[in-house]
Amino acid sequence: MDPKSKAPKRDETKGADDASGRRYLDGQLLIAMPVMEDERFARSVIYVCAHSSEGAMGIIVNRPAGSIDFPELLVQLEIIDKADQIKLPENAETMKVLKGGPVETGRGFVLHSSDFFIKDATLPIDEGICLTATVDILRAIARGAGPKHAILALGYAGWAPGQLETEIQGNGWLHCPADADLIFGGDIEAKYSRALHKIGIEPGMLSNEAGHA
């Protein structure tokens, strides 16, 4: 991982091969293999938001932030007053806050269902899944006008050009199609085993051999 990598622009040919035959993985899940040397990404599941010749950007979807919940974050950002925490809609009260990765950890990225869209701010990634990184979506969620499904990630994971491909070739990651139910639903810490089960693998079966489904 390159913690200084900037998020690349999303290539409009999502999932397509480039001229050199490389396949871009935006809209897919990365599942860390046991040989992952970087402890920050051990047993991580990452949703790839952008992947092109410029590099890659993704959000870790199974790492709770722990130190703050969504209502507290809204107060810190002065979107609501402290007294208004008890008046939030249920989906705002229970919205998950995650450690999205080591890059720009002070910035929020909302992965959400496609029933919410802000012109020039929302990036459609795959069918039913979008990314918005402006405070407007937090305001919408706070007043009950946001997307039906959403998670907030602080920071993201970034790769320099060709770096993700090298890590996959080095047995660092499995990759498979994304699952909206896995991204938005269920216990956060169970997502690693759920992602493996999705491609027919028991966690104990993992070895040093990488591949994809």
Curated annotation (Swiss-Prot):
Give the start-end ranges of region Disordered: 1-20
Q: Name one Pfam family in it.
A: DUF179
Q: Can you tell me where the transmembrane regions are?
A: none
**Which InterPro entries would you find in this protein's record?**
AlgH-like
On the tree of life, the source organism's domain of life is Bacteria
Q: Which GO terms describe its cellular component?
A: cytosol
Q: Which family does it belong to?
A: Belongs to the UPF0301 (AlgH) family.
Q: What is this protein called?
A: UPF0301 protein RPC_0788
Q: Which organism is it from?
A: Rhodopseudomonas palustris (strain BisB18)
